[in-house]
Amino acid sequence: MASLYFVTGTDTEVGKTYCTAKTVERMRECGQRVGVYKPVASGCELRADGQRYSVDAATLWQAAGRPKNIDAVCPQRFLAALSPPQSAAREGVKVDTRQLRDGLAIWCDGDFDVVMIEGAGGLFSPISDDWLNVDLAIEMKRWSDQNGHSFELLLVAPDRLGVLHHVISTSRAAESAGIPIAGLILNRMDDHADESTQTNAEDLRRWCGIPMVASVRQPSGPLVVFSGPNGRNASGETSRETAGGVNFLNQTTIRR
């Protein structure tokens, strides 16, 4: 059965796609068969051949080695750079809420050890007229439990002053929804980092007890995975092994 990871952010434009792609590449280097699924994308480009091009979906597909086809990676693609339901409304249609979840099944056919699912925006951003991202994650976890797959959240947040509140509130909301968190990636979006970047990772490990905390030191730099003393997390427990024996990023530095 597959290990499923739902990637969400504390906001939009925090580097979810970059971090997801780097994670996918590392897992493939470790011998994992990785599928990628982006249920819906907005802000797509309309090509001359009439195809809708999502740079995020294409980036994930390329990182995974181009499995299946781009329509399986991202079956719903809209043009306006708005939230998915607003972007769809501009075209006189609605996001197909059920397809958001049902499109996952094609990636859980036994061909993949790991499936990375990238949401749209933050955990409480609307993804359709009926659901927020958290609602989709809950539905996917329910489906995963019924079909014998594991399901966890991977959180991406900007590494800057104020991130403690955003990560703690998001992680507690996820836990209240019954969604376990596999890890956190802090993305340093600005070359001029503030002083909080020296302590954010350690503070979040202590306050959240998240098993894995990583940091992208710049958008073009390496992804460095931090661990607690003796490879233990903030709660003192040995880090969980997921993704077919890979301890998520396994204290690995991923270089662009």
Swiss-Prot record:
Coiled-coil positions: none
Pathway: Cofactor biosynthesis; biotin biosynthesis; biotin from 7,8-diaminononanoate: step 1/2
GO molecular-function terms, A-Z: ATP binding; dethiobiotin synthase activity; magnesium ion binding
Residues that bind Mg(2+): T17, D56, E118
Keyword set includes Transport: no
Cofactor names: Mg(2+)
UniProt superkingdom: Bacteria
Subcellular location: Cytoplasm
Root EC class: ligase
CDD domains on file: DTBS (cd03109)
GO process terms (BP): biotin biosynthetic process
Positions bound to substrate: S42
Record: residues binding ATP: E13, V14, G15, K16, T17, Y18, D56, E118, G119, A120, G121, N187, R188
Alphabetized InterPro entries for the sequence: DTB_synth_BioD, P-loop_NTPase
Keywords: ATP-binding, Biotin biosynthesis, Cytoplasm, Ligase, Magnesium, Metal-binding, Nucleotide-binding
Cited Pfam families: AAA_26
Stored Gene3D superfamilies: P-loop containing nucleotide triphosphate hydrolases
GO cellular component terms, A-Z: cytosol
HAMAP family: BioD
Binding partners and assembly: Homodimer.
Function: Catalyzes a mechanistically unusual reaction, the ATP-dependent insertion of CO2 between the N7 and N8 nitrogen atoms of 7,8-diaminopelargonic acid (DAPA, also called 7,8-diammoniononanoate) to form a ureido ring.
Similarity field: Belongs to the dethiobiotin synthetase family.
Protein name: ATP-dependent dethiobiotin synthetase BioD
Source organism (scientific name): Rhodopirellula baltica (strain DSM 10527 / NCIMB 13988 / SH1)
Lineage, broadest ranks: Bacteria, Pseudomonadati, Planctomycetota, Planctomycetia, Pirellulales
